[in-house]
Regions:
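Soluble, non-membrane globular domain cores that form compact, hydrophobic packing
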Residues: 6-9, 17-86, 91-197
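Positively charged n-region of N-terminal signal peptides that target proteins for export
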Residues: 1-4
Length: 197
């Protein structure tokens, strides 16, 4: 009887995790489909910005893809190039797993910078423009090359990310330019809260 109960518990946990990943995969496909007219999805030979300790985590599900513009346009250095953005999605099994990942990520954040939960920073050395959306058990990170940063385009990316990967209670962190500033722009945690410290 005990084995049967254990089996049912395991089966229920597996189905729950599968449903989570299925929903997330649908959101990823929806996000990619919305941008399909102007961006191609690349999944091979990806580099992108260093995400510090988050890259060492072992989430229940993760993916990394690059959206590359189909048409060339001019970047901040006057070069004709295909604009691109790297997107990484990490889904953890439980909220506790996500909180532990955040606790390890804050002292080793993007490009190995130290970030204090809920506190903005004027600079973030060597960090490229980035948007982080934390919602439920999912962390979604979008990074852009520094030479391609443009505030209006950045705001458009933020809107699209929060539409597909955010919600009313999601936390949003932005590196609004080359090397900062870092801003907690939505639902910043209380700096006194020890959950992510």
């Amino acid at each position: 009887m005990y084995r049967f109960g254990l089996f049912l518990t395991f089966l229920a946990a597996s189905l729950s995790a599968s449903a989570q990943s299925s929903d997330l995969q649908q959101r990823i496909k929806g996000f990619q489909s919305e941008l399909a007219a102007t961006y191609a999805v690349k999944t091979l030979n990806l580099q992108g910005e260093s995400l510090g300790a988050l890259e060492k985590e072992e989430p229940a599900y993760q993916t990394h893809f690059k959206l590359e513009a189909k048409e060339k346009s001019e970047d901040n250095l006057g070069r004709s190039t295909k604009l691109n953005a790297h997107i990484r999605v990490f889904e953890f099994e439980t909220l506790d797993d996500l909180n532990w990942a955040m606790k390890r990520w804050m002292p080793d954040f993007i490009d190995h910078n130290v970030v204090k939960p809920g506190r903005d920073a004027k600079t973030l050395p060597h960090a490229d423009p980035s948007i982080v959306v934390i919602d439920g058990t999912t962390i979604t990170v979008l990074t852009l090359p520094c030479s391609q940063f443009e505030l209006e385009r950045f705001r458009t990316w933020r809107k699209q990310l929060t539409t597909y990967f955010g919600g009313a209670s999601s936390v949003v962190i932005e590196v609004q330019g080359c090397e900062g500033p870092l801003l907690w722009t939505k639902n910043a945690p209380d700096p006194k809260d020890r959950t992510w410290k």
